[in-house]
A protein has these predicted regions:
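Small beta-barrel nucleic-acid-binding modules, primarily SNase/OB-fold domains
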Residues: 1-131
């Protein structure tokens, strides 16, 4: 793993962009014309740091679902370290919301349940929000 781009995307050493399946984190930048500008949404920086803590200096493994690439050319994957699935950990910690986009639904039920528990416990981005 080379670089954490944001809370749900990493760039490998060969330049391949990996977008985590089943999660959505707050953005840290947005496009203005042809430029990317820093514009963190609430909890965007925290989600990026949580992702960094989960994958930095770790060997990762990728699990694919039905669709392997998104419309931007990024590889879609469930990302694993020796500690488990990063996608699930981000939701469990409250730094990501579950986001199901068929046909990539292999772990959707589990991710939704983790999201429900994080929301009820008001962890991370769910803090101070209505249950």
């Amino acid at each position: 793993m080379a670089q954490v781009v944001d809370g749900d995307t990493i760039r490998l050493t060969d330049g391949t962009m990996i977008r985590y399946i089943g999660v959505d984190t707050p953005e840290v930048r947005r496009r203005e014309g042809t430029q990317w500008v820093s514009a963190p949404e609430p909890y965007g920086l925290e989600a990026t740091e949580a992702n960094r803590m989960l994958v930095a200096d770790r060997t990762i493994r990728l699990e694919y679902d039905v669709e392997t690439h998104d419309r931007y050319g990024r590889v879609l994957a469930y990302v694993y370290t020796d500690d488990g699935m990063v996608n699930a950990a981000l939701i469990e910690q409250g730094y990501a919301a579950p986001m199901t986009i068929p046909p990539n639904v292999r772990h959707a039920d589990m991710l939704r349940e983790l999201g429900r528990a994080a929301r009820e416990a008001q962890r991370g981005l769910w803090k101070d929000r209505e249950r």
